[in-house]
Swiss-Prot record:
Compartments in which it is found: Cell inner membrane
Protein name, per record: Di/tripeptide transport system permease protein DppC
Residues annotated as domain ABC transmembrane type-1: 99-288
UniProt entry keywords in alphabetical sequence: Cell inner membrane, Cell membrane, Membrane, Peptide transport, Protein transport, Transmembrane, Transmembrane helix, Transport
Transmembrane regions: 33-53, 103-123, 131-151, 152-172, 202-222, 225-245, 267-287
PANTHER family the record matches: D,D-DIPEPTIDE TRANSPORT SYSTEM PERMEASE PROTEIN DDPC-RELATED, OLIGOPEPTIDE TRANSPORT SYSTEM PERMEASE PROTEIN APPC
Highest taxon in the source lineage: Bacteria
Highest classification ranks of the organism: Bacteria, Pseudomonadati, Pseudomonadota, Gammaproteobacteria, Pseudomonadales
Amino acid sequence: MNAMHNAPASDPSLVYPSPLKEFWQSFAHNKGALGGLLFMLLIVFCALFAPWVAPYDPSEQFRDFLLTPPSWLEGGQARFLLGTDELGRDLLSRLIHGARLSLLIGLSSVVISLIPGILLGLLAGFSPNRAGPLIMRLMDIMLALPSLLLAVAIVAILGPGLINTVIAIAIVSLPAYVRLTRAAVMTELNRDYVTASRLAGAGTLRLMFVCVLPNCMAPLIVQATLSFSSAILDAAALGFLGLGVQPPTPEWGTMLASARDYIERAWWVVSLPGLTILLSVLAINLMGDGLRDALDPKLKNAA
């Protein structure tokens, strides 16, 4: 009799997966997101271990091998897999070391814009009649300007360089986090659990950071992923315009700028950095789509 009562409890069909396992199953179901994750893991590995992965120092010049084509083309050298640039520097080594800066800029700008964006969004959501309108009008003004133009203006004021590039991209990304956080907060404030917390005597800070904010993180995680790809793209654009990281530091946008005069007779010095930017941004966007599908209950149920 006891065995009959205990049988349903041991039925595997009644055992629910953990939230992490359920998230991974939903994310891995999206083949594009999984491919993007694998590509980004490769980029991160190369960036972290660049001194050991790269065949040469990114600034080392081989004067006898200027604009050498990739190894599979006529005139290529096996020692230079992706060829060399106009100064005889190994292109593969510069791309690998350039990944470090691109990932650093993307991660730093996301963190710098995410934290104040969440705080301002919470303040705007909890103060809809006072601070909220002022914050949102300021965000509307920032959104009215093209993001790249605003970033160029900020860097032009602060001066070119790595830190100023990160600051400019972070400022440009700020309105998206503020608006998204405020919208999520306004939705959550009408939930029963928030009302129950108020009646239980929870203060404003507890409501903000303990009750409401954890339930707003799913869209913010997706937005942070998409902003990461936008930051890499903006950093490359600023570097191409000469306002980002300055030569001879290897950075994908700067590599494009220095090689644009050789596009007709040495296509690889322009195409390969551009292709690296394209694939990295595409991989991160695919990851963002997978995260959105895995974290959004509506999309998960629809699937």
